[in-house]
A protein has these predicted regions:
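Non-transmembrane functional regions of envelope-associated proteins
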Residues: 2-204
Length: 204
């Protein structure tokens, strides 16, 4: 105990931490994040009313290469509705016309509970995505969030038909782990809601 309270120990500890910070500026922050992870770890809760539908290797073997024809997605929407799905979310974007000519049928399936995603990009693009109205109070939110120069938007007819469209992006911490999801994102000086926020709006 005397050693821990001695001035020499304090000086050595301070110099060591300073040296480690200079050697690797993100090291202490990474350690702090790992400690926080251990403090908030709790038993996993299983949610039965959320279902994930994945595009598997077997699906690609049956229906061909990705992207799948839009009528397959339309049939999936129909089956999910028959199973009383409240909100249907696509964690992928549809920026191009369907190669099999199924755009019209897919568009008709998008109203009433279908949420599409679009993905921000660091590559500048000419076309802007559909923008959901966001009311700002107390300053410009773009001063505090990352403003992407481009976005991988869906076809305009899809975005006009869908119940909602949200940004699907993640911001990993310095150790590469995703712990938080932004509720809004800036793209080409406009604000876009996250996919999580759009799901919440549609569900409530």
């Amino acid at each position: 105990m005397k050693i821990l309270l001695s001035p020499l120990f304090a000086i050595i500890t301070t110099l060591t931490l300073t040296w480690l910070t200079l050697l690797n500026p993100t090291l202490l922050q990474s350690i702090d994040l790992r400690i926080s992870d251990q403090l908030i770890v709790k038993e996993k809760e299983f949610v039965e009313d959320v279902v994930l539908v994945d595009i598997s290797e077997k699906t690609l073997e049956v229906h061909g290469q990705y992207p799948l024809p839009r009528d397959i997605y339309g049939d999936l929407i129909l089956r999910l509705r028959q199973a009383n799905a409240g909100v249907i979310v696509f964690n992928l974007s549809f920026p191009e016309e369907d190669r099999t000519g199924q755009d019209e049928g897919f568009t008709l399936m998008l109203p009433n509970g279908v949420i599409l995603s679009h993905f921000p990009s660091n590559k500048a693009q000419n076309r802007s995505a559909y923008s959901t109205a966001i009311v700002q109070v107390g300053g410009d939110a773009l001063d505090y969030i990352y403003n992407y120069p481009g976005i991988a938007a869906n076809l305009e007819k899809y975005e006009n038909a869908a119940t909602g469209i949200g940004i699907a992006n993640t911001l990993p911490e310095i150790d590469g782990v995703v712990r938080r999801l932004p509720m809004i994102a800036g793209v080409q000086d406009k604000l876009y809601p996250s996919i999580v926020l759009e799901i919440f709006k549609a569900y409530t």
